[in-house]
Amino acid sequence: MRRIVTAFILSLLLIACGEAPLKEYSLEVVAEYPHDVESYTQGLFFQDGQLYESTGLRGKSTFRKVDLQTGKALERLDFDKKYFVEGSVMWKDNLYILTWDTKTAFIYDANTLEYKSTWKYPREGWGITTDGKHLIASDGSANIYFLDENFAQQRKILV
């Protein structure tokens, strides 16, 4: 009898914990823009009216300032074949670019795209962005890392 009562209570709890209906969203395509089919996009951001893209392929990684209307690169950085470029972001007048498996980060001048420095990055570089106070990076794990401009970890969160 005790098992029956326990099973009954559990079934009532399961019914009470039913899933909420899924919210549905719709979308509308308002514009389409050309894109270089040779670029394998890893990072993409739009800043101050300009589109920027980091592309990663073994031996063909680039960072590009892109003309939105034509899809053509207005400016371009080509990386050594050993680097597989991933995420990129501009913050505090710097352009930060992460590489995937070589665990390297590059810093360029955000205005001129002139090289500034290379940093050894402690993990795989995947995505990177900023909240205006920190660089925020992912490495493919369940962690998001908040970093200062020298890539020193300030905190991390589990997602």
Over which residues does each language-model region extend?
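A short helix->beta-strand "capping" segment at the edge of beta-propeller domains
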Residues: 20-38, 68-74
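C-terminal motif of bacterial Sec signal peptides marking the signal peptidase cleavage site
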Residues: 13-16
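Beta-strand-rich domains and repeat architectures in extracellular enzymes and scaffolds
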Residues: 30-62, 76-89
